[in-house]
Curated annotation (Swiss-Prot):
Belongs to the CFAP298 family. GO terms for biological process: regulation of cilium movement. It comes from the Eukaryota. The lineage of its organism: Eukaryota, Metazoa, Ecdysozoa, Arthropoda, Hexapoda. This is Cilia- and flagella-associated protein 298.
Amino acid sequence: MVLLQVKRGDELIFLYETSVKEKTDTVLRELVALHNGQLKIQRVCMEIEELAEHGTMVPPEMIGLNEEQREELKLKDVWADKCIPSGGFTINKDPLLRRNGQQPTEAMQKVLAGAMNDAKAMVDRRLAKSSKTLTPKIVEEALNLLRGGVTIVYPMQLPPHDSIRMEFTNTEDLTGTQASKEVIEPSKAQFWFAGHQMLMGKLMSDYLGHNDKTKVVVKLNQIGEGPPGREAVISDPLRRQMMAEAYRRQEELKKLEQDDDDEYLNSSWADSGSLKRQAHGLENVRFRFRK
């Protein structure tokens, strides 16, 4: 199987296994679904943190209004009495005025926290550095963990306008949010290899060759974003090492310019036999003669 190191910009977001015989359309569609799935889980977890602190969301027309304003406008959250967390709640008002302030019990908060931690661990971008691949099944299992945790705490479900429930039913509206800039629209998706766009209607082998045991970097973006930057020819650690070596050499040359004698002949790089001794492992060999 070909191992794709999938990046968004310069960030490695996950590893994905495929075949050189697979169609580019199929691969791109799945890569976009995995990327957007990662983002969905991040968004849901952020909202569940708020749910554990301040309860369910108030209706859209009440968001941002304090109690006096709601009373003045005769607005009431009819879902507050229907969507009560298991074990009851305590009042913890939401400073952002988005949620009803009915905080679940400590035990139920732990249920939500456990589901969040497990789900985030399953799709963590750092897994790519541990050579662990991401699959649609893993993303779906992570979402099911979150659904299960929320259902335990809210057996009567969340209000239909709650952003968590909307995420679960894929009816979320991200218009005007920062999240909307991160999500890739499938119809506008592109992916690139070695500075070249991988076009639809092709096979992966058209770009990667027929070796099914290789590892390559591909980059995701959208129409209008332009070609992503090429991968660096050398890695950052190697680049830093080369710069340090160049600096050391420069300092040594400066020192030689200040010397009036032949001290440079004592330097290892000036010894014509040094490279040969290194190749044969004789660099630090010393001979001791007995009388």
